[in-house]
């Protein structure tokens, strides 16, 4: 019985070490991938030296950064945006524009990788705001750290250009959540904001 418990404990320690080693390799790969922007990511890590939870959050973001990018803006992208902005509210796009841009795919544009351009300041602001929302909103408080990292911490959701969306959304919708809704149901809160 004692040997079985010891074997289980030893196995758990080995698995934990292997996972930690894998995460370290991912972090090193991401820092190397950043090339000339590596200093920004190192500044971020240095910033949270004395806050272990935020440091782990920063490492999570950096480890996942080689897969995050947006597309180069300007030129064709601006033309498509202009057409979509003007015609989308009316429900139809003029046939002239449809013929010209109907086949267009922005995925042919050059990718701009976050690791190459993102700043420590942007990430620090994002991490601090995410932690504030984790504690401030009742529906976020029950999230584990792993769920927080997966669902609340990320600074982007797709391939959109980098922007300071947390501040914008907090200014636009925060007062509704602060003054009208006091519950803990995230779906109900989202419904309130979308009205």
Predicted regions span which residues?
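Serine/threonine-rich low-complexity intrinsically disordered regions
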Residues: 5, 19-23, 51, 94, ...
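Bacterial Sec-dependent N-terminal signal peptides
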Residues: 1-25
């Amino acid at each position: 019985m004692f040997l079985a418990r010891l074997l289980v404990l030893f196995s758990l320690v080995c698995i934990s070490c292997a996972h930690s080693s894998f995460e370290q390799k991912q972090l090193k790969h991401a820092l190397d991938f950043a090339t000339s922007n590596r200093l920004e990511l190192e500044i971020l890590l240095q910033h949270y030296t004395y806050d272990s939870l935020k440091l782990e959050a920063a490492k999570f973001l950096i480890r996942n950064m080689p897969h995050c990018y947006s597309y180069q803006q300007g030129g064709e992208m601006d033309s498509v945006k202009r057409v979509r902005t003007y015609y989308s509210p009316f429900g139809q796009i003029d046939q002239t524009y449809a013929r010209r841009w109907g086949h267009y795919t922005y995925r042919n544009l050059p990718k701009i990788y976050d690791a190459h351009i993102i700043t420590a300041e942007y990430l620090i602001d994002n991490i601090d705001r995410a932690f504030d929302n984790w504690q401030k909103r009742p529906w976020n408080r029950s999230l584990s750290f792993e769920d927080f990292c997966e669902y609340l911490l990320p600074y982007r959701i797709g391939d959109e250009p980098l922007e300071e969306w947390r501040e914008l959304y907090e200014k636009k919708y925060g007062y509704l959540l602060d003054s009208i809704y006091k519950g803990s149901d995230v779906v109900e809160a989202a419904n309130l904001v979308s009205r």
